[in-house]
């Protein structure tokens, strides 16, 4: 409603029509809000009902499993439930035992791998110690020109196999010759290693004996000299 005068270009009939239109718009807006609220309430009810359904189904299944069905005696049903519980407990224990066995097998594998890695390392250290003495005494050997080279029986057999074009036999004999030469080198290196070790032990024992001997101090030496001089007085 207009208080006072109307604006220019408007009549009372126009003002009444405008007020009626505003009222209808307000009523329609209220109706829309009410419809939206009703829809939201319905959606929440549907969601609650859907969430409650699986719980009720699971509970009903559990109750149906625990309850004795019709036509079966109660004693038999109780025995069946006890057997079912024992079976489930056995499954759980077997699964735990398998897990422990797997852990043990993994630990055993790791131990074996560590042992395998440690063994080659010790062998490698021993081999390095021996390789230091390879060819140590070669300088004492006479030169090749003055040496009377005499072929061994194995070398003669290799030459014979080569002349007969028997390559496989020649390769086998050459491998045997190489292993023999390597064995000789290793034996010489071991002898040198043992000699050096024994020499070091003797030197260390001599040094320890020298340390045990009491060294003459300046004052002790002076006293000894004075005592010896007093004997001649």
UniProtKB/Swiss-Prot annotation:
UniProt entry keywords in alphabetical sequence: Coiled coil
Coiled-coil ranges (or none): 144-164
InterPro entries referenced in this protein's UniProt entry, alphabetically: FAM204A
Compositional bias per record (Basic and acidic residues), positions renumbered to this chain: 39-58
Record's keyword annotation contains Coiled coil: yes
Domain of life (superkingdom): Eukaryota
Biased composition (Acidic residues): 13-24
PANTHER family: PROTEIN FAM204A
Biased composition range(s): Basic residues: 97-109
Designated gene of the protein: FAM204A
Lineage: Eukaryota, Metazoa, Chordata, Craniata, Vertebrata
Listed name of the protein: Protein FAM204A
Region described as Disordered: spans on this chain: 1-126
